C-alpha cells in the first residue's frame, strides 16, 4: 500500500514513482451479499459531489493571472467533506476509502446510523467496516460518555489525552478543521496551557501553539504518508494536475522580471520576486499579528 516505481520503458516512466491505489476499496451490497470493490471499481457517492468553479489561477472579473503557473488540468468534481464533525454521538460505519482529486489525502465515506452519509479525511489505520463517532462540546460538558481514543473519532481538544496524535484541528470553534489535513500530516496534543481555556498543540511545522479547548480535532494521523515519495516522472503528468511551466526570471526580459535582461546569462542581482519583493529568506509575515499571542514556541524551537 502506498507507491510503486514504474519500469523504465520510456523516458516518462524512467524516474516515475506513483500511487499503487491499493488502499482504495468500497463495501457494496449486491443482492443478499456484501462485495468488496477495489481500485478503479470504486465510484464516489453522487449525493456528495458538486461542480466547483475552477479559477485556474485567474481572477473572475478580468481573467488576470492571480496565481502563476496554474491552469488546465483534468476535469473533476468536488467531494463535500465534513471538516466540522458536528454529528454528535451517532455511530458511523466506514463503507469506503476513496481517491479525492482535490487533495493529497484519501477520503472515506461514512454511513451514519440515522441514514446520513458524509465524507471525512481518511486517518491512518482506519479500515472499511470500522465504526467511528464524534462528540460535541455540549454533550461532553453534559457528562455523556466520550468516544474511544482511536483513529477516526473526533472530540474537543479538552478531552483528548496528553501526547495523542491528532489531525483536522479547528482554529476557531465551529468553523471546521483547518490544520493537518494533507496526506501524512499530524499534530500532537501536549497538555493544558497556563492560559485558561486553552490547550497546547504542536503543529506539523514544529510550532507550539495555544488552541481553544472547544476546538474539535480528530484522533490519528492522516493516511497515505507515502505521498512525499511520489515523483511525477514527466511534465505532462504535472499538466494533468493543473500545473503549468515555471519560467525563470533570468530567462525573461527586463520589462517582465527584475532578473531579466543582460547579454547572455547574468548574475549578481539580489533575489527578487516578479514584483520587486526580496525573496529567499525575506520575512513576509506581519511583525505584529493578533495570533502572535497564541504562539508559545516557534517552529525553529525559539520562544516568540
UniProtKB/Swiss-Prot annotation:
Instruction: Check the record and name the SUPFAM superfamilies matching this protein.
Output: Nucleic acid-binding proteins (SSF50249), Translation proteins SH3-like domain (SSF50104)
Keyword annotations for this protein, in alphabetical order, are:
Ribonucleoprotein, Ribosomal protein, RNA-binding, rRNA-binding
| Xref: InterPro entries | NA-bd_OB-fold (IPR012340), Rib_uL2_dom2 (IPR014722), Ribosomal_uL2 (IPR002171), Ribosomal_uL2_bac/org-type (IPR005880), Ribosomal_uL2_C (IPR022669), Ribosomal_uL2_CS (IPR022671), Ribosomal_uL2_dom3 (IPR014726), Ribosomal_uL2_RNA-bd_dom (IPR022666)
Stretches for region Disordered: 246-282
Instruction: Kindly list the GO CC terms recorded for this protein.
Output: large ribosomal subunit
Q: Which Pfam families match?
A: Ribosomal_L2 (PF00181), Ribosomal_L2_C (PF03947)
Basic and acidic residues: compositionally biased ranges: 256-272
**Biological process GO annotation list?**
cytoplasmic translation
Does Ribonucleoprotein show up as a keyword for this record?
yes
Q: Which GO terms describe its molecular function?
A: RNA binding; rRNA binding; structural constituent of ribosome; transferase activity
The record's similarity note reads: Belongs to the universal ribosomal protein uL2 family.
On subunit structure and binding partners, the annotation says:
Part of the 50S ribosomal subunit. Forms a bridge to the 30S subunit in the 70S ribosome.
Q: What does this protein do?
A: One of the primary rRNA binding proteins. Required for association of the 30S and 50S subunits to form the 70S ribosome, for tRNA binding and peptide bond formation. It has been suggested to have peptidyltransferase activity; this is somewhat controversial. Makes several contacts with the 16S rRNA in the 70S ribosome.
What is the protein's given name? Large ribosomal subunit protein uL2
Amino acid at each position: 500500500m502506498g507507491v510503486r516505481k514504474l519500469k523504465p520503458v520510456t523516458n516518462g516512466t524512467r524516474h516515475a514513482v506513483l500511487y499503487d491505489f491499493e488502499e482504495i476499496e468500497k463495501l457494496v451490497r449486491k443482492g443478499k451479499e456484501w462485495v468488496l470493490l477495489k481500485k478503479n471499481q470504486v465510484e464516489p457517492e453522487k449525493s456528495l459531489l458538486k461542480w466547483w468553479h475552477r479559477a485556474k489561477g485567474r481572477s473572475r472579473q478580468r481573467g488576470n493571472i492571480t496565481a502563476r503557473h496554474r491552469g488546465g488540468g483534468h476535469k473533476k468534481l468536488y467531494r463535500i467533506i465534513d471538516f466540522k464533525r458536528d454529528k454528535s454521538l451517532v455511530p458511523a460505519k466506514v463503507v469506503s476509502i476513496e481517491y479525492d482529486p482535490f487533495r493529497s489525502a484519501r477520503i472515506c465515506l461514512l454511513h451514519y446510523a440515522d441514514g446520513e452519509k458524509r465524507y471525512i479525511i481518511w486517518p491512518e489505520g482506519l479500515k472499511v467496516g470500522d465504526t467511528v463517532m464524534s462528540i460535541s462540546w455540549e454533550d461532553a460538558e453534559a457528562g455523556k460518555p466520550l468516544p474511544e481514543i482511536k483513529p477516526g473519532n473526533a472530540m474537543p481538544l479538552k478531552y483528548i489525552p496528553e501526547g495523542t496524535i491528532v489531525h483536522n484541528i479547528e482554529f476557531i470553534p465551529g468553523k471546521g478543521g483547518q490544520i493537518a489535513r494533507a496526506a501524512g500530516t499530524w499534530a500532537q496534543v501536549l497538555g493544558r496551557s497556563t492560559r485558561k481555556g486553552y490547550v497546547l498543540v504542536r503543529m506539523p511545522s514544529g510550532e507550539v501553539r495555544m488552541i481553544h479547548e472547544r476546538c474539535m480535532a480528530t484522533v490519528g494521523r492522516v493516511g497515505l504518508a507515502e505521498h512525499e515519495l511520489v515523483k511525477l516522472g514527466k511534465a505532462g503528468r504535472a499538466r494533468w494536475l493543473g500545473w503549468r511551466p515555471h519560467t525563470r526570471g533570468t530567462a525573461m526580459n527586463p520589462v517582465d522580471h527584475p532578473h531579466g535582461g543582460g547579454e547572455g546569462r547574468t548574475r549578481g542581482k539580489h533575489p527578487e520576486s516578479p514584483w520587486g519583493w526580496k525573496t529567499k529568506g525575506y520575512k513576509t509575515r506581519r511583525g505584529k499579528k493578533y495570533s502572535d499571542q497564541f504562539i508559545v514556541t516557534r517552529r525553529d524551537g525559539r520562544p516568540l
